[in-house]
A protein has these predicted regions:
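Conserved N-terminal phosphate-binding loop of PLP-dependent enzymes in the Aspartate aminotransferase
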Residues: 1-228
Length: 228
């Protein structure tokens, strides 16, 4: 859709996977050892909850510099809304919306990696938790769903022929995914009073108690939802 644009932007310390392509995006060089370079990737700082305003300004400033330095060369911004390298680090709605606005202003698609976050916050999707419904172009899910899937906005759908049965999961795996998604959606797991938040609050309260007792040994943040 964005050809010949070929560059990608991601967050520092992100993890996107280990395949030949996405290992190029993962911000850890040891995962690329021995692999050929397939993508040109640039990075911006992830959200810093200790300095909200500065964090937004820095991210926007980095993006604007890249888009000025390499005009029309960026195809996508790949985002984890909650990072899982070295603990769980939770982003921020205002921060993400500012980034999405700059990307769309420069014709750069926003891809949300929900392989880790799908069905693990108080909403089905983490992008819904951060109220990014109108800002997202492509979403990837996996892990809890037992199968992987990519969801596109209408104007980002691949043309016929690009995706075939080669990439289709087995019928049993798809049935398992359907059962799990239905269970999470309809049996009290979601919402502020749902099972996922209840479990999180239980563990967070115990971790807070340990923090008070051993402040030099353990400290937050404690993640979000089932990501503790």
């Amino acid at each position: 859709k964005k050809h010949p644009a070929h560059r990608v932007i991601a967050f520092e310390k992100c993890f996107m996977g280990r395949t030949l392509a996405v290992s190029q995006i993962t911000d850890k060089h040891v995962y690329r050892d021995g692999l050929p370079q397939t993508l040109t990737v640039d990075y911006i700082p992830f959200y810093d909850a200790s300095n909200h305003e500065r964090s937004i300004k820095m991210a926007v400033s980095h993006l604007e510099w890249y888009f000025t330095r390499y005009p029309n060369q960026y195809a996508a911004m790949c985002m984890e809304l909650i990072q899982g390298e070295g603990g769980y680090w939770v982003g921020n709605e205002e921060y993400f919306k500012a980034i999405c606005d700059v990307c769309h202003k420069n014709n750069v698609s926003v891809i949300i990696d929900e392989v880790q976050t799908f069905m693990r916050t108080e909403e089905m999707f983490a992008f819904q938790y951060f109220k990014l419904d109108q800002h997202v172009d492509i979403i990837n899910i996996g892990k809890n769903s037992q199968i992987c899937a990519t969801i596109y906005k209408e104007d980002h759908k691949p043309r016929p022929g690009l995706i075939s049965q080669t990439f289709t999961s087995s019928g049993s795996a798809i049935n398992s995914a359907y059962y799990i998604i239905n269970e999470i959606a309809n049996n009290g797991y979601l919402g502020k009073e749902g099972k996922i938040n209840t479990i999180h609050n239980h563990f967070a309260s115990k971790l807070d108690a340990l923090n008070r007792k051993y402040p030099d040994k353990i400290e937050g943040p404690w993640g979000i939802g089932a990501m503790i």
